[in-house]
Amino acid sequence: MPILAAVDDFLFRSKIRATAKHVNAEIVFAQTPDEILAQARSLKPTLVIIDLNSTKADPVGTIAALKQDPALAGIRAIGFASHVHADLIAAARGAGADQVMPRSAFAGNLADILTSGLS
């Protein structure tokens, strides 16, 4: 099953893509809330990764929509953001994110995170 990612930053997208290739994970990118939810419905990924600093994804609203939809609520949602955005991290947790971490921790554990999304 693919992993769905909502990440605006092209450098970070390429890092995710390269790491996914290394661990044999299929990654699909989506940007807007409608795209993310539509891809989640059609692909049924085991994991959705959301950059909480995304300007296109409405990250907190999209996480809430995922978790409020009975067909999508079981999909694990991981958010990441700059550690200085404590309010954004708290909002993502409040919206139902399964895990929220600083961007540096996400980058450092990316291979493990992607591998965990394979099952």
For each predicted feature, which ranges?
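Conserved phosphotransfer cores of two-component systems
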Residues: 67-73, 95
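A short, hydrophobic beta-strand element within the central beta-sheet of small alpha/beta folds
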Residues: 74-83
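Conserved acidic segment of CheY-like receiver
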Residues: 1-10
